[in-house]
Structures are given as C-alpha cells and as structure tokens.
C-alpha cells in the first residue's frame, strides 16, 4: 500500500484539546467488520458487546514526565530536552532528543531547575536531534530519578495537542491501570476506561490481561516513504507475561472474544505468536509495522482512538477493520462530529 492512501482532510477544530469530563463518556463508534454496519454509542456502552469469559488486553505502561526545559551553559539559551530512555543507571546516562539541536554539541553542559540544581553533560550525538546525556548527580539512583522527574512535565504530543500542559494532564494522560514506567506517550485507547466501567466489566465476567509496551515517539514520526514496505518502525520495549498468555490463550481455546485495547497492544501481541496461533511469553523489543493487508492471529476485536492522517496508528486500524471500511468510517466520524487525537473519541471494531 501507499502512504498517500491514508491521507484525509482533518480540520484542526476536530482535534480534541481536552478529555471529556468522565473517562467513559467519550463517544464510541462501533464498526461491525463483516456487515459494515456502524453504530454510534457512548464509550461506557462497550460493555454490551462482550460476555462472560471474553478478554480485554490492556497495555499497563506508565508515562513518565519526559519533557524538560533548561538552559545552556554560558549563553543561557533556553533548550528543550525530551527524555527517551535511561541507558545506564549507574552512570546516569540517558538517550534524549534536544531542541534546538544545532546549538547543543558534545561537551556542552545543560542546566535544569530554577536553581540549576540538575546538570547534564552532552557526551554523544546519536541522530540529528538525538544526544546521550550524562547527568552529574551524586546520591542514590531513586533520589536522582525523583529529582529528575520533578523537573519534567507531562509529554503531551505537541504535533496533536498544540497547547500548554495543564495540571489535569498528569492524571488524564495516564490510564487508571498504568503501572510499569517507561512510556513517553500514553496508549490512548486505554484512557477511556474508568474504574466504574472496569468494575461493571468484571461483574459481567469479562477477564483482563495486561501486557507492557513502552510507547515511544516513533508513533508520531512522519513516514518519509510512499511505499510502506520500505518504512522502518522505531523499536519499543515490550513484555508479555506468562499470566497474560494463560488468560488470552484460554479465551481463544474456548472460542471467546479477545479485544486488543489500542494499537500498542495489537502490535505487541502480534509480535509474539506461536505457529498454532497462540500468544507466547516474550521480553524484548519489537519494531513490527502493521499495515493492510495483514492477517491477525490473536485478537478478533479492537478499540482505538481516531488517529491522524498518514499515521502508522491509522494503518494498524485499517489493517484490522479493512481499509475501505475504516476510511469510510473516518469520513463518517468527521461528519458526525467525533473528536480526533489523543484526547478524542474511540472506535470499537468487531469481527462480526
């Protein structure tokens, strides 16, 4: 498939700048894959499409405050540092992106905090914007991490949410079950699940399985090739535990529904499948890129937000729901006033 096939006109006012007051009160478009039928519901109605022993697979990654603002030594120029991942605990080494990149060179010292209490030295260039920083901090690692994160802010994707970070973002840009720290962006489909909704799902007998995929900035990176077979995804760290495997495979063996909550879950579970179509334990990295046509093995239902034009996330959804049906559904969503993006509305795709 070609990149240009995922282009559509998305007016700026259709992008949600804030979440709905209650997590489960966003709108939900339900697409029935086999018939093409579309229903317009509230997110809390998702419960009505699943039964006892069906399984929802969630990504329990936790977003950390990855965006820092600081100053460069001598010039005092304001800089932005985006923390990607810690490379070495002992040496306090971090893989980061910097802005403005042309002014930040090896050997430069960067200062953070009102009193310049946190200092980092640039020790390597990794890409045009990528750098390796060594933080000059004496003290236990836990203390360092706490001090570093206290200086950071919620890493809202500026390409989608073009507004300053607000207090509520620290809570709302995080799922209620976020546990394993390591993501620099939230798995957005999971943001719709409230405690009340999950309690009602439990009462109905629906099972939950949790995997971890630390969502990275690659989700927002522009694709620069027209031929999608030539695109390379950034690698992301993922963990599929024995417990998750048991829950998912039991549901599959019983002929029950398995619903992947979000594109990160779909990529993770499709990255570790045995030849007989069962989920396998896995700890490592994935750079799996899913686009149409693609045969899915594990899940037969999927929840996802409404994504940006030309994004890899839209491609996964189109691969699962069928290209024509999903693109038609997106046009209907625009016409019906659905909200797009990180804090937008959701779509449920059912294989029936």
Curated annotation (Swiss-Prot):
Which chemical reaction does it catalyze?
7-aminomethyl-7-carbaguanosine(34) in tRNA + S-adenosyl-L-methionine = epoxyqueuosine(34) in tRNA + adenine + L-methionine + 2 H(+)
Any one of the GO CC terms: cytoplasm
Q: Where in the cell is it found?
A: Cytoplasm
| Keywords attached to this entry | Cytoplasm, Queuosine biosynthesis, S-adenosyl-L-methionine, Transferase
Q: Does the keyword Transport apply?
A: no
Extract the GO molecular function terms from the UniProt entry: S-adenosylmethionine:tRNA ribosyltransferase-isomerase activity
Q: What is its EC number?
A: 2.4.99.17
> Is the keyword S-adenosyl-L-methionine in the record?
yes
Main location per the UniProt record: cytoplasm
Q: Which Gene3D superfamilies match?
A: QueA-like
Cited InterPro entries: QueA, QueA_dom1, QueA_dom2, QueA_sf
Q: List the disulfide bonds.
A: none
Q: Which GO terms describe its biological process?
A: queuosine biosynthetic process; tRNA wobble guanine modification
Pathway in which the depicted protein is active: tRNA modification; tRNA-queuosine biosynthesis
The main enzyme category here is: transferase
> NCBIfam families of this UniProt entry?
PRK00147.1, queA
What's the subunit arrangement here?
Monomer.
Function comment: Transfers and isomerizes the ribose moiety from AdoMet to the 7-aminomethyl group of 7-deazaguanine (preQ1-tRNA) to give epoxyqueuosine (oQ-tRNA).
Report the family membership. Answer: Belongs to the QueA family.
Q: What is this protein called?
A: S-adenosylmethionine:tRNA ribosyltransferase-isomerase
- Which lineage is the organism of this entry classified under, starting from the top rank? Bacteria, Pseudomonadati, Bacteroidota, Bacteroidia, Bacteroidales
Quote the gene name from the UniProt entry. Answer: queA
